[in-house]
From Swiss-Prot:
Its main location: cytoplasm. The active site is at residue 185. Residues 55-335 form the Deacetylase sirtuin-type domain. Zn(2+) binds at residues 193, 198, 219, 222. It holds the Pfam family SIR2. This is NAD-dependent protein deacetylase sirtuin-2. InterPro entries: DHS-like_NAD/FAD-binding_dom, NAD-dep_sirtuin_deacylases, Sirtuin, Sirtuin_cat_small_dom_sf, Sirtuin_class_I, Ssirtuin_cat_dom. Binds 1 zinc ion per subunit. It catalyses: N(6)-acetyl-L-lysyl-[protein] + NAD(+) + H2O = 2''-O-acetyl-ADP-D-ribose + nicotinamide + L-lysyl-[protein]; N(6)-tetradecanoyl-L-lysyl-[protein] + NAD(+) + H2O = 2''-O-tetradecanoyl-ADP-D-ribose + nicotinamide + L-lysyl-[protein]; N(6)-hexadecanoyl-L-lysyl-[protein] + NAD(+) + H2O = 2''-O-hexadecanoyl-ADP-D-ribose + nicotinamide + L-lysyl-[protein]. One of its GO terms (molecular function) is NAD-dependent protein lysine deacetylase activity. Disruption phenotype: Morpholino knockdown causes aberrant angiogenesis with excessive intersegmental vessel branching, due to excessive expression of vegfa. GO terms for cellular component: centriole; centrosome; chromosome; cytoplasm; cytosol; glial cell projection; heterochromatin; juxtaparanode region of axon.
Length: 379
């Protein structure tokens, strides 16, 4: 402890109100302990410059968050998103009982559900992962309302960054660029040979062709497995996650958390990296992130606090992600614009898919004709 902090501890220990605590009863002893802990938290918060300061939100409601966004004081929004933002696109989340991904993997005969995303298991038994990838491959789904809401934040100059746990690339399909995104758990956008001596890179189209031809992707240079650049259990997160985190979160003036259970570290602990004045909005089916992430004394309110008497910046809006986004858009006066964006972009995707289907059908027809002509000549 520094000399300055030690001095302040001694000075504030003499503060009236901390003297004369009685030990006559266990209740009074507990109260004394709570008071001393509150005192220490307060002291370290002030000493390290982490005290809440003035409230930014006038009330802990979605309406207040909307007013804050419209005030002009909110210019660096960070979005933290998980699988819940993609469920309305038809992509299952991981943990929902009965419908989540982990609850529906019995057909792959795994030793346990998480094995399908463990790097050691994948290297020995890649078949279950690639079978699942055929079912969930990016490009089979359309972005949701929330994906386009993030794009709208970018278009309005309000988005600092989107930190995503998802590997479905729907943020990119919705119009976000690589610089707008931190894909914390990786992406299907690129793939690499798993051999440390090779590491040859492959495109998304190459991987897609391999997966839908029902072949196990192998490197054409060394013969090793090729794996999409998603982060498996047992692998490190992308280095950009850590470098961007240090630059982004101190600048954040509104954190929007959506569709994540906040159970997977280190992603979950990002909520504690914004300043203590920064409002945090959770849009989810249930409240989450309320633990202190094991930070003990130095957890200066790092966990979400929606309901206590000391709550001052955390807002929970319990709904589906799409409904919550549309409600917020309406409060911001952006609802019609968002609805039109979703309709327009989905129509473009349908048009591209139709052209692609026609092209594939034409190529298939030409191949069939060529094969028939070849057969006729042979006969």
């Amino acid at each position: 402890m520094s000399e300055e902090v030690s001095k302040r501890v001694e000075e504030e220990a003499d503060t009236p109100g901390l003297e004369g605590q009685s030990d006559d009863s266990s209740d009074e002893g507990d109260a004394s302990g709570d008071t001393e802990m509150d005192f220490l938290r307060s002291l370290f918060s002030r000493t390290l410059g982490l005290s809440p300061g003035d409230k930014v939100l006038d009330e802990l409601t979605l309406d207040s968050v909307a007013r804050y966004i419209l005030s002009g004081k909110c210019k660096n929004i960070i979005c933290m998103v998980g699988a819940g933002i993609s469920t309305s696109a038809g992509i299952p989340d991981f943990r929902s009982p009965g419908t989540g991904l982990y609850a529906n993997l019995q057909k792959y005969n795994l030793p346990y559900p998480e094995a399908i995303f463990q790097i050691d298991y994948f290297k020995k038994h890649p078949e279950p992962f690639f079978a699942l990838a055929r079912e969930l491959y990016p490009g089979q789904f359309k972005p949701t309302v929330y994906h386009y809401f993030i794009k709208m934040l970018k278009d309005k100059g309000l988005l600092r960054r989107c930190y995503s746990q998802n590997i479905d690339t729907l943020e990119r399909v919705a119009g976000l660029e690589g610089e707008d995104l931190i894909e914390a758990h990786g992406t299907f956008h690129t793939s690499h040979c798993v051999s440390f001596l090779c590491r040859k890179e492959y495109s998304m189209d190459w991987m897609k062709n391999q997966i839908f031809s029902e072949e196990i992707p192998k490197c054409d240079s060394c013969g090793s497995l090729v794996k999409p650049d998603i982060v498996f259990f047992g692998e490190s997160l992308p280095s950009r996650f850590f470098t961007s985190m240090k630059a982004d979160f101190p600048q954040c003036d509104l954190l929007i958390i959506m569709g994540t259970s906040l159970q997977v570290q280190p992603f979950a602990s990002l909520v504690s990296r914004v300043s203590n004045r920064c409002p945090r909005l959770l849009i989810n089916m249930e409240k989450t992130g309320q633990s202190e992430f094991g930070m003990g004394l130095f957890s200066f309110g790092g966990g979400m606090d929606f309901d206590s008497d000391k709550a001052y910046r955390d807002v929970a809006h319990l709904s589906t992600c799409d409904d919550g986004c549309m409600t917020l858009a309406e409060l911001l006066g952006w609802k019609k614009e968002l609805e039109e964006m979703v309709k327009r972009e989905h129509a473009l995707i349908d048009s591209k898919d139709a052209k692609k289907t026609d092209k594939e059908a034409s190529q298939s027809s030409k191949s069939a004709v060529a094969e028939a002509e070849k057969t006729d000549k042979t006969e």
